[in-house]
Amino acid sequence: MTGDRRLFLVGLSHKSAPIDVRERVALTGDALKAALCELKAMEGVTEALVVSTCNRVEVFVHSDRPDAARRFFTERSPAAADHLYAKDGVEAVRHLFRVASSLDSMVVGEQQILGQVKEAYGLASAASAAGSYFSRLCNRAFATAKRVRTETEIGRGATSMSQVAVELVEKIFGRLEGRAILLVGAGKMGALSAKALAVLGADRILVTNRSPERGLALAAQVSGSYRGWEELQRLLGEADVVIVSTGAPTYVVTRESMHAAMKARRRRSICLIDLAVPRNVDPACAELSDVYAYDVDDMERVVATSKQARQGEAIRAEAIVEAEVMAFAKEREARAALPVLAQLRRHAERIARAEAERTLAQVGGKLDDKGRKSVEAMAQAIVNKLLHGPTSRLKEAASSGDSALPGAAAELFGIENETAGGERREGGAEGAAAAPGAGPVRSQGT
């Protein structure tokens, strides 16, 4: 069943699904690009955006088919169906603005999510899945997030999953000086972890990464040491703490490798923190004696205190988000009137042109060029004067959020309302504004 084209969101996050469900539908690299192409090819979908992070996978589509995004999930993992949430229209807009502003994050106020949403939009644009609608929507979301960041102190305290992980390590071990801390992965999460460790006084930071160049660069930034990827097994036997965050789709630390490492450690305990989704550390490692393993879902309990401390700032941030959502909706309503105005003008000019041609045909050759132009100018002047009032009132109504008047005007004048229901053809509104009619009345005859 089809309807009006608008924004639809279907997704799951740390709030609705455990990590073992989220990792089944997580999308990265080529899989994410393929997903965008698949969504764009769905019947009724004009634009698509996918936000996939360690804590959420969300699909946004501009479509007239409410079930398009849901089918995308259920076809990949039937188990995801029980964990999905769905929003549309203004509610979907509000959700994206809250996500970009880190108000829906596990760590409220964290800075990474805005970059991740920007990256998601960049990928969608590069894949030709995002067009004019998502350009307006996402840029407004980014501006909202910037306001939240600059007008509140929502980012105060531990504001990334990596920082939370490092604070957990500090709570477990106390002082970090002298502790051997191994970072497996030198991407964004690894870099954030390294910096947070250095701030807390860690002085034995080891880095291993599949790409030596990236690993060497990160180790140098924090006065640490780089070790080759082939040394991972030996390093598991030496480190007190292992923080894992690679882009690998499978485990890089298995139960078997950890079992062998514990033999070499002679029962010396180890802390494993897995910040990756899909997980990089086999959950079965936690079954081994003296192995203390944590994944991203375990971090939620750690951040509870930090979240409570920022509650007041979160309330201020929510007010900013709400104001921006309403402003975006109001602008959309104003744009909704533009195609109706363009059609109304074209409709009036067609009638005026036909009447001018009929009049000129009746007078035959009695009028010279100047006379014919006078008739055409008179017809155009009548159109302009008749439409001046309705045009002004339509624009005023749209600016005040009245979406009913454009539809009523279309019905009253007997023209098709291309924007009935709100956003159905929002992508073409700018074009209609740029070319609001067929031009001045010109006779097609003599």
Swiss-Prot record:
It is an enzyme of class 1 (oxidoreductase). The active site is at residue 54. NADP(+) binds at residues 185-190. Substrate binds at residues 53-56, 105, 110-112, 116. Residues 431-440 have a biased composition (Low complexity). It holds the Pfam family GlutR_N. It catalyses: (S)-4-amino-5-oxopentanoate + tRNA(Glu) + NADP(+) = L-glutamyl-tRNA(Glu) + NADPH + H(+). InterPro entries: 4pyrrol_synth_GluRdtase (IPR000343), 4pyrrol_synth_GluRdtase_dimer (IPR015896), 4pyrrol_synth_GluRdtase_N (IPR015895), GluRdtase_CS (IPR018214), GluRdtase_dimer_dom_sf (IPR036453), GluRdtase_N_sf (IPR036343), NAD(P)-bd_dom_sf (IPR036291), Shikm_DH/Glu-tRNA_Rdtase (IPR006151). Pathway: Porphyrin-containing compound metabolism; protoporphyrin-IX biosynthesis; 5-aminolevulinate from L-glutamyl-tRNA(Glu): step 1/2. Keywords: NADP, Oxidoreductase, Porphyrin biosynthesis. The keyword Mitochondrion does not apply. One of its GO terms (molecular function) is NADP binding. One of its GO terms (biological process) is protoporphyrinogen IX biosynthetic process from glutamate. The keyword Iron-sulfur does not apply. Possesses an unusual extended V-shaped dimeric structure with each monomer consisting of three distinct domains arranged along a curved 'spinal' alpha-helix. The N-terminal catalytic domain specifically recognizes the glutamate moiety of the substrate. The second domain is the NADPH-binding domain, and the third C-terminal domain is responsible for dimerization. This is Glutamyl-tRNA reductase 2. It comes from Anaeromyxobacter dehalogenans (strain 2CP-C). The lineage of its organism: Bacteria, Pseudomonadati, Myxococcota, Myxococcia, Myxococcales.
